[in-house]
Every structure is written in C-alpha cells, then in structure tokens.
C-alpha cells in the first residue's frame, strides 16, 4: 500500500526538522510540493524555511523565541508556549489563539480566586498561603497544578480536582485545610503533600 498526498502530509506533521521535509520531497518525486500544501507551519521557521511554506494562513508560535512572520496570507496566530492570563487578556482581541494559559499568583491577586475557564494551568505559588480561601472550583480546562499552588491554604475545606489534571506540582496541597480529604484520592501523588523536594530522597 502506497501513501497518498493526504497520508504523507499527516505523517510529515510530526517531523521536527526542516531537513526531514526537504529530504522527503527530494527523495520521493511524487511527494514534491508537500510543504506547499500546508496552510500552517508544523515546525518553527526561520527566514530560509519560511519560503518553503508559501501558503501559510495560520502561523503557529511554539516557543517564545520563535521568529514571527506577518506577511503573505497569514491572518491568525496560535501560541503554544505558556502565557499568563493577564497577557492573554491584553492580546486576545488580536485574532490569536492561546493553547497554554497560566493563572499566575499575580493574576490571582489582580482578578481574584475564581479560576477563569480559559485557564489551562495554575502557576507556581498561585494560591500560596491564601488563608482566606475556603472553596475552589478548578475548571476541566486545567491540566496542570504548579508547585506549592495551594500551599498552607489553611481555611480551604472544599476543592474539586477534575480528571483533566495530569500534572501535579510538589507541595501543591501541603498543609491545606482539606489535605486529609485529598489524600483519599489515590490518583494524587504523595509528593503533593510534602513541603520540599528533598523530602522525596531522604
């Protein structure tokens, strides 16, 4: 069974280097023009590689240091690196799409204890020693809780932990008010209830 144009395009989406795209087209004649079929950039681009993807309409920015192009047919940007909720609010009207929005300690102090539904992660120390916090609802959009996120939230008596969360930070529930109740959830790692990293290797 031979791969067709659509199949090879799907496969090449997972290439990590521009040379892989070039070698594909040079090595297999019938796949020449593969890069021209892309309407988004599957990898970060520089001044040279940008010319090989002439039909991009949606530009993906994978790392903060990536070169950004604004010419041609590009009308939308998709940002993959972590962006604070504050920055997201500042720039969301610019036809951008943010894949990893972090609710930081600064955001929490500015916008309050209610976690916005756009948020994908809770930053390090986000609710650190927030002793006034009694209940918290974590949206299902959240997939990560940072280190010491709810550290010593002594008044916290109710928290929902959605199954969407796949990454828990060290000490994120250390000495919070409902620590014993959270410990009953066996899917949550023990290091979430330790204060320091070195406690793991004692």
Q: What role is predicted for each listed range?
A:
Residues 46-53, 64:
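Long, charge-patterned amphipathic interaction tracts in eukaryotic proteins
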Residues 18, 33-38, 53:
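N-terminal export/assembly leaders
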Residues 65-67, 73:
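Intrinsically disordered, low-complexity regulatory domains of metazoan transcription factors
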Residues 1-30:
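N-terminal Skp1-binding subsegment of the F-box domain
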Residues 20-25, 39-48, 78-121, 131-144, ...:
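Structural signature of tandem-repeat unit edges
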């Amino acid at each position: 069974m031979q791969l067709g144009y659509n199949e090879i395009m799907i496969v090449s989406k997972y290439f990590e280097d521009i040379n892989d795209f070039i070698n594909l087209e040079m090595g297999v004649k019938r796949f020449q023009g593969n890069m021209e079929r892309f309407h988004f950039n599957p990898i970060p681009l520089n001044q040279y590689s940008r010319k090989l993807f002439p039909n991009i309409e949606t530009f993906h920015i994978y790392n903060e240091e990536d070169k950004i192009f604004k010419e041609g047919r590009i009308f939308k940007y998709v940002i993959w690196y972590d962006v604070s909720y504050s920055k997201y609010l500042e720039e969301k009207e610019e036809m951008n799409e943010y894949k990893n929005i972090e609710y930081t300690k600064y955001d929490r102090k500015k916008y309050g204890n209610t976690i916005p539904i756009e948020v994908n992660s809770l930053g390090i120390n986000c609710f650190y020693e927030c002793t006034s916090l009694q209940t918290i609802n974590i949206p299902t959009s959240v997939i990560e809780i940072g280190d010491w996120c709810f550290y010593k939230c002594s008044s916290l008596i109710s928290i929902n932990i959605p199954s969407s969360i796949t990454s828990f930070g060290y000490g994120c529930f250390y000495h919070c008010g409902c620590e014993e109740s959270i410990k009953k959830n066996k899917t949550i790692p023990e290091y979430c209830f330790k204060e320091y990293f070195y406690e793991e290797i004692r």
